[in-house]
UniProtKB/Swiss-Prot annotation:
GO aspect biological process, one term: translation
Role of this protein: Located on the platform of the 30S subunit, it bridges several disparate RNA helices of the 16S rRNA. Forms part of the Shine-Dalgarno cleft in the 70S ribosome.
Any one annotated GO CC term: ribosome
Protein name (database record): Small ribosomal subunit protein uS11
Keyword Ribosomal protein among record annotations: yes
Length: 129
């Protein structure tokens, strides 16, 4: 039985001028994915992927760091301006948008794409602290 050689695909530098930054901010984490206009992923990051654990993942600072990491990776592919699509009720929404602007990406539009149920499934019970 021959051993299979582990060949890893090299990351190709794409030349993409503009794209869409999808910020998914939940109560527990913030995910930032930057795609080309067709929706193909260029770069992504999250608070958990950067080493934040537990309740620290849900902070605005963790969202800011995740946003900066994704923006730097996207700028390596030649990205200059992005549209921002924000989804979810988390605390890191505004911090992530501000971090994208601070890294040098030009934000052309901000859209809120949070899904709103037309009376779908029953929500989780209220917390009693």
């Amino acid at each position: 039985m021959a051993t299979k050689k582990n060949t890893r695909k090299r990351r190709v530098k794409k030349n993409i001028e503009s794209g869409v930054a999808h910020i998914h901010s939940t109560f527990n984490n913030t995910l930032v994915m930057i795609t080309d206009p067709q929706g193909n992923a260029v770069a992504w990051s999250s608070a958990g992927a950067l080493g934040f654990k537990g309740s620290r993942k849900s902070t605005p600072f963790a969202a800011q760091m995740a946003s900066e990491a994704a923006a730097k990776a996207a700028m390596e592919h030649g990205m200059k301006n992005v549209e921002v699509a924000v989804k979810g009720p988390g605390s890191g929404r505004e911090a992530a948008i501000r971090a994208l602007q601070a890294t040098g990406l030009e934000v052309s539009a901000i859209r809120d794409v949070t899904p709103v149920p037309h009376n779908g499934s029953r929500p989780p019970k209220r917390r009693r602290v």
